[in-house]
Amino acid sequence: MLDIQQIQQIIPHRYPFLLVDRIVEVEEGKRAVGIKNVSANEQFFVGHFPEYPVMPGVLIVEALAQVGAVAMLMKEENRGRLAFFTGIDNCRFKKQVKPGDQLRLEVEMIRFKGAIGKGKGIATVDGELVCETEMMFALGEK
């Protein structure tokens, strides 16, 4: 399990754009599971939407990408590098995410060749699917 400080040692994201609170499972270079506790105080709720706060779907996908980056960058040969988000395929949103929800973010690497990878991401709240997607990554130097 990784806490927020340990996550920040692996990926460069910081508040307000760090969208993972902790990693609860990880297999280096293969898969990871993260948790995001969605607070009513999230900055994006100020404008999305003031009378009906809903977490933007693109930020759910970004949270999945951050979990995938942790999995990839924990692999010994990738430590100290950056993971760049390069594409999204087959993305579907099934349910809204609101203040008070806890997002479970699961990412499994499907393919990894050289510096390019592809992962499948699933986000759930209380066991219900809210988002599924395939994401592409490229590893680069800082």
Curated annotation (Swiss-Prot):
Keyword Ribosomal protein set for record: no
Organism ancestry: Bacteria, Bacillati, Bacillota, Bacilli, Bacillales
Enzyme type, top EC level: lyase
Lyase as UniProt keyword: yes
Active site: H48
PANTHER family: 3-HYDROXYACYL-[ACYL-CARRIER-PROTEIN] DEHYDRATASE
Record-level GO cellular component terms: cytoplasm; membrane
Database matches in InterPro entries: FabA_FabZ, FabZ, HotDog_dom_sf
Catalytic function, reaction form: a (3R)-hydroxyacyl-[ACP] = a (2E)-enoyl-[ACP] + H2O
Keywords: Cytoplasm, Lipid A biosynthesis, Lipid biosynthesis, Lipid metabolism, Lyase
Functional description taken from the UniProt entry: Involved in unsaturated fatty acids biosynthesis. Catalyzes the dehydration of short chain beta-hydroxyacyl-ACPs and long chain saturated and unsaturated beta-hydroxyacyl-ACPs.
Domain of life: Bacteria
Compartment list: Cytoplasm
MF annotations from Gene Ontology: (3R)-hydroxyacyl-[acyl-carrier-protein] dehydratase activity
EC number: 4.2.1.59
GO biological processes: fatty acid biosynthetic process; lipid A biosynthetic process
Family: Belongs to the thioester dehydratase family. FabZ subfamily.
Record's protein name: 3-hydroxyacyl-[acyl-carrier-protein] dehydratase FabZ
